[in-house]
Regions:
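Signature of N-terminal electron-transfer/Fe-S-associated modules in redox systems
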Residues: 1-162, 168
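Flexible, low-hydrophobicity surface segments
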Residues: 152-224
């Protein structure tokens, strides 16, 4: 297969990619750069789970070929934290319980980041418009919208809610930090070193008639 060198900034660091120019950015982030915070949902640009920032604008990484990334500045959910400290938006997500199952969370954070870079104190309509390309099945969107609208009131130093036996008190999710910084591991994010992999082969013919010939020679040469 043909290869092409792409050079770009990834979360503030200069990176090189030499490989299939048609490989999707979402897959390259996960496979080649081990950044599994970017999730692949529909793989068709509909759900928005794979949203990243390219030159400051939100984009579905599953729809961007690596050949298009040369010279770009790419930011993923892993690039939001600084020195291990959550940024104000991530802290707002924890406070409002905006990260539930976590699949859409990275995409929501990146879409919201683009908005907040332009409008630090957006109104509800602006937030709804900015998040319109990212689908969520858990939250009903209200907590996410609240978090984005309140993000300007948080800082990196905003203390977390108390963790412990506090009956009647609102607590942050135990796994909340991992969900908002992109380190939470889902089924497709890791595999044992000795895992067996399957490859799906599709017929190049949309409509074809198959004729089964004599299988005797094949059966004779096959064990079992």
């Amino acid at each position: 297969p043909s290869t092409r060198l792409s050079q770009f900034s990834l979360n503030g660091e200069a990176r090189d990619y030499k490989g299939d120019p048609f490989k999707r950015l979402a897959n390259a982030l996960r496979d080649d750069f081990a950044l599994t915070g970017t999730k692949v949902g529909c793989d068709a640009g509909d759900c928005g789970a794979c949203t990243v920032l390219i030159d400051g604008r939100q984009a579905c990484a599953c729809m961007v070929a690596m050949a298009q990334t040369d010279g770009c500045e790419i930011t993923t959910v892993e690039g939001l934290s600084s020195a291990g400290e959550l940024n104000p938006l991530q802290r707002a997500f924890l406070h409002h319980g905006a990260a539930q199952c976590g699949i859409c969370t990275p995409g929501m954070l990146m879409a919201a980041t683009e908005l907040l870079n332009r409008e630090p104190e957006p109104d509800r309509t602006s937030v709804e418009d900015a998040l319109g390309g990212v689908l969520c099945r858990c939250t009903g969107y209200q907590t996410i919208i609240d978090a984005v609208m309140d993000a300007h009131t948080f800082t990196e130093a905003t203390p977390a809610r108390h963790h412990g036996p506090s009956v009647g008190s609102r607590l942050e999710r135990i796994d909340g930090v991992a969900k908002v910084n992109g380190t939470d591991q889902f089924g497709a994010d890791s595999a044992p070193a000795d895992a067996l992999w399957l490859r799906l082969y599709r017929s190049p013919h949309a409509r074809a008639t198959f004729q089964v010939g004599d299988l005797g020679e094949f059966v004779a040469g096959s064990d079992g």
